[in-house]
UniProtKB/Swiss-Prot annotation:
Gene3D superfamilies in the cross-refs: QueA-like
Any one GO molecular-function label of the UniProt entry: S-adenosylmethionine:tRNA ribosyltransferase-isomerase activity
Keywords: Cytoplasm, Queuosine biosynthesis, S-adenosyl-L-methionine, Transferase
A GO biological-process term: queuosine biosynthetic process
Chief location category: cytoplasm
Location within or outside the cell: Cytoplasm
Name of one Pfam family that matches: Queuosine_synth
Catalytic activity: 7-aminomethyl-7-carbaguanosine(34) in tRNA + S-adenosyl-L-methionine = epoxyqueuosine(34) in tRNA + adenine + L-methionine + 2 H(+)
EC number: 2.4.99.17
Pathways involved: tRNA modification; tRNA-queuosine biosynthesis
Protein name: S-adenosylmethionine:tRNA ribosyltransferase-isomerase
Taxonomic lineage: Bacteria, Pseudomonadati, Campylobacterota, Epsilonproteobacteria, Campylobacterales
Length: 342
């Protein structure tokens, strides 16, 4: 079988000390590895110098906003419970939600949280997932009311590879400066590097567009089948404004900031769907057909995200660049450094 389709072909070894537990401060001082595909050139610089390398292009950002999706509570017996909200079931008659619960629970069990928030376990699903209903003062909470309450009592859901509790600084650090549409349970991390000053400077030379893709917990789901074509990609809600669609439909060069932007642009390029659910899986055998350039962080081995990067530059080239980044001690994952692919 073609090696590009084998999960084991996307593996690499990373020392724990290269996993960033906190962002660089100031954030635009993060490092940036630039790879020019046409000339096969590599540059090592800092993120604040991004504009020095950008060609004439429109820049697309994901303006999703991370929910405080993690809450801690108790069972009636007093046992501790941790609930991680994933997403609402949009097609259900009553407001129901998908959540991951740490701790053994039964169907119809009631769980208790701060501010008189109660959760009823409606259904036990696979992979530790549960269908749940939220109540406060015995009234069912819809998505909007729940998100407002979580903003008071919830915690920022840091990724599983950041081995610490969330802190006050994460409220700002794990949210992009243009985040406005609540619904993500993970940040579109390439966006986290941008400061207001950088954005202002970019606007002077580039057209900026926003789209929304609510990053789901599935972004951390590991690929378990050796033939990656058998992997079932998670589905995430997206919305693209008309003006952004017109740019995608044009011949204008596009820089996508982050893998979520890339998947949304490429889904639209294939389907002409402006609003719905995206489950597009990009890899070297299913490469991009519209987006020209990519700005992204360094991703986990064997993840759909490293496969997406490989779809742009080829698997072997991607692994070579990761090997170089490790040698040069770049910082990896959500709070880590960035890579620009031209």
């Amino acid at each position: 079988m073609n090696k590009d389709l084998l999960l084991s072909s996307y593996d690499y070894t990373l020392a724990n000390e290269l996993i960033a537990n906190y962002p660089t401060n100031p954030k635009e001082d993060a490092r940036l590895l630039v790879f020019d595909r046409k000339n096969k050139e590599i540059f090592h610089t800092t993120f604040k110098n991004l504009q020095d390398f950008l060609p004439n292009c429109a820049i697309f950002f994901n303006d999703t906003k991370v929910i405080k999706a993690r809450i801690y509570g108790n069972k009636a017996s007093g046992g501790k419970i941790e609930l991680f909200l994933h997403q609402p079931f949009l097609n259900s008659h009553d407001p129901l939600f998908l959540a991951q619960i740490k701790g053994r629970v039964k169907k119809d069990e009631i769980l208790y949280f701060k501010d008189d928030l109660k959760v009823r376990v409606v259904e036990l699903l696979n992979d530790g997932l549960r269908k749940v209903q939220f109540f406060q003062n015995d009234k069912t909470l819809d998505t909007s009311n729940l998100y407002n309450l979580l903003d008071k009592i919830g915690h920022i859901p840091l990724p599983p590879y950041i081995k610490r509790e969330d802190e006050k600084s994460d409220l700002k650090d794990y949210q992009s400066i243009f985040a406005k549409n609540l619904g993500a349970v993970a940040a579109p991390t390439a966006s986290l590097h941008f400061s207001e000053t950088m954005l202002e400077n970019l606007r002077k030379k580039h057209e900026i567009y926003h789209l929304t893709l609510h990053v789901g917990a599935g972004t951390f789901k590991s690929v378990e089948c050796e033939n990656i074509q058998e992997h079932k990609m998670h589905s995430e809600f997206f919305n693209i404004p008309q003006q952004a669609c017109e740019i995608i439909d044009s011949k204008q060069a596009i820089l996508g900031v982050g893998t979520t932007v890339t998947r949304t642009i490429e889904y639209y390029a294939r389907t002409k769907t402006k609003n719905g659910f995206c489950d597009l899986f990009l890899h070297p055998q299913n490469p991009p057909i519209r987006q020209n350039h990519l700005l992204t962080n360094f991703h986990l081995p064997k993840s759909t995200l490293i496969m997406l990067v490989s779809a742009f530059i080829g698997r072997e080239q991607c692994l070579k660049l990761y090997e170089l980044a490790i040698k040069e001690k770049y910082r990896f994952y959500s709070y880590g450094d960035a890579m620009l692919i031209l």
